[in-house]
Amino acid sequence: YLAGLEQPIDVMIHNAGIHLEIRHETADGLETNFALHYLAPFVITKLLMPKLSRDRTGRIIFVGSEGYRFAMWGLDLDDLQWEGNKYSGLKAYGAGKLAQLLSMHIFAKELAPYGATINTMHPGMVRTETGKDNGKLYKWYKRNFIDSRSAAPEKSAEALYCLGASTAL
């Protein structure tokens, strides 16, 4: 479907997110956090890069997270699937977000000749459904501590709109 798009793309926003306490795999056998936060945006960006506006106005925006810090010891390139290491939802989330952030630098070099911009933005703490399938303790903690201190999704949407539409960038 994506390869068949004919119009140029002005703005591409990668805004999917998930947090899982227990290791899950996609239908293709990939660890879900890594597939969603890194592999999917990477593949979609590579597929659609030729469609990005080449008139120095094309933009790619990754919705990142300070959660990349949960992978503070770096990516275990020998175990991106979390098959050998003990699974940690926070570390898996961090690994996916760190890989996403690092890939942004690769894409920036590829896009430089066209003048397209690429940004990662941390939306802050936002009330979302992320983690809704986790256990009771996580749900309680999210409801009582995270969500009560989090902004409405519309606030993050304003920042995304600015990155996508501002002529100053």
Predicted regions and their residues:
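Proteins with a high burden of low-complexity, intrinsically disordered sequence enriched in S/T/G/P/A and R
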Residues: 1-5, 36, 137, 163-169
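C-terminal helical subdomain
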Residues: 96, 143-169
